[in-house]
Amino acid sequence: MAASVPWACCAVLAAAAAAVYTQKHSPQEAPHVQYERLGADVTLPCGTASWDAAVTWRVNGTDLAPDLLNGSQLILRSLELGHSGLYACFHRDSWHLRHQVLLHVGLPPREPVLSCRSNTYPKGFYCSWHLPTPTYIPNTFNVTVLHGSKIMVCEKDPALKNRCHIRYMHLFSTIKYKVSISVSNALGHNTTAITFDEFTIVKPDPPENVVARPVPSNPRRLEVTWQTPSTWPDPESFPLKFFLRYRPLILDQWQHVELSDGTAHTITDAYAGKEYIIQVAAKDNEIGTWSDWSVAAHATPWTEEPRHLTTEAQAPETTTSTTSSLAPPPTTKICDPGELGSGGGPSILFLTSVPVTLVLAAAAATANNLLI
């Protein structure tokens, strides 16, 4: 009897291990996929479990707070994009998986924006579309093209998923084209359509390889060249005209030149020494609209190289002084009477630095006065 107890314990443990193994490795039911609108409230039931069943909810492997539960149901309010994920409901005691929901939060589509353009005239045209706002969930688009009552094939672009191409069946047709597009997702659908004449959607791609160069010895000229867009299939039969605009970087106002033919132009009124920005657009000679502007080219008109002048070394300046033969202006000095002796005779004024003849004349005049 004592020996049977260990055997019983082993049997229980083996059964438990088998149950755990079976739970982990048995194939599980694929999760239910559910789409809900952004901002809405949603209630997720725990599969077929009763309302009062003891369950635990997880999202992406993380336990959810019990206050989000109403019985066994999970309540999510004011859905945000972050609520998207894999929700799983487990039996609280055995952790047996009861139910899974893969929740996607998004929006129904708004009216799509549709446009058509022929940049390969006369081969065909393409139509492209997009939604004005994202839906955050997968969308399906369906395009229908009619030429009168005839349905035309719209071949999907291999690189751009929101574009398809249509070949012209009849050139210069007066019958209008009608293009319709519908979009749908799990939360709703929408449609739009446009009608147009063949010639109204012709719009070439911008000119290519726009290059601007200075003209040697011409400080106000720039030579501009470009190429016809490579997507334009037959420029000989369907020639293009061009529109050139240019301005110095220091100004905001453009100058324009329309050219009926050719792929080159010389600007003759550029500001000397100022950098310029140049762009070119293209248009069919007869129909359609102007292309977008090309990639900008930059150039500065020719400027003369500064000259480096070599000069001979200047000789050091020499100062030549000459002595004037004229004596400097005389200075007058009144002699001190004490220097003339102690006699009581009249004082005699001596002018120093005065020519001798003047001194002698003054002495003679004094003597005559004494004799009188």
From Swiss-Prot:
SUPFAM superfamilies: Fibronectin type III, Immunoglobulin. GO terms for molecular function: ciliary neurotrophic factor receptor activity; cytokine binding; signaling receptor binding. Residues 343-372 form a propeptide. A motif (WSXWS motif) lies at residues 290-294. Residues 108-205, 206-306 form the Fibronectin type-III domain. It is found in: Cell membrane. Residues 27-104 form the Ig-like C2-type domain. Disulfide bonds join C46-C89. It is a lipid-anchor; GPI-anchor. Glycans are attached at N60, N70, N142, N190. It comes from the Eukaryota. InterPro entries: FN3_dom, FN3_sf, Hematopoietin_rcpt_L_F3_CS, Ig-like_dom, Ig-like_dom_sf, Ig-like_fold, Ig_sub, Ig_sub2. GO terms for biological process: brainstem development; ciliary neurotrophic factor-mediated signaling pathway; motor neuron apoptotic process; negative regulation of motor neuron apoptotic process; positive regulation of cell population proliferation; sex differentiation; skeletal muscle organ development; suckling behavior. GO terms for cellular component: apical plasma membrane; ciliary neurotrophic factor receptor complex; CNTFR-CLCF1 complex; side of membrane. Residues 301-338 are annotated as: Disordered. Residues 311-326 have a biased composition (Low complexity). Keywords: Cell membrane, Disulfide bond, Glycoprotein, GPI-anchor, Immunoglobulin domain, Lipoprotein, Membrane, Receptor, Repeat, Signal. The keyword Transmembrane helix does not apply. A lipid is attached at S342 (GPI-anchor amidated serine). Residues 1-22 form the signal peptide. The keyword Cell membrane applies. Forms a heterotrimer with LIFR and IL6ST. Interacts with heterodimeric neurotropic cytokine composed of CLCF1/CLC and CRLF1/CLF-1. Either alone or in complex with the heterodimer CLCF1-CRLF1 interacts with SORL1; this interaction may promote internalization and lysosomal degradation. Binds to CNTF. The alpha subunit provides the receptor specificity. Belongs to the type I cytokine receptor family. Type 3 subfamily. The WSXWS motif appears to be necessary for proper protein folding and thereby efficient intracellular transport and cell-surface receptor binding. This is Ciliary neurotrophic factor receptor subunit alpha. It comes from Mus musculus (Mouse). The gene is Cntfr.
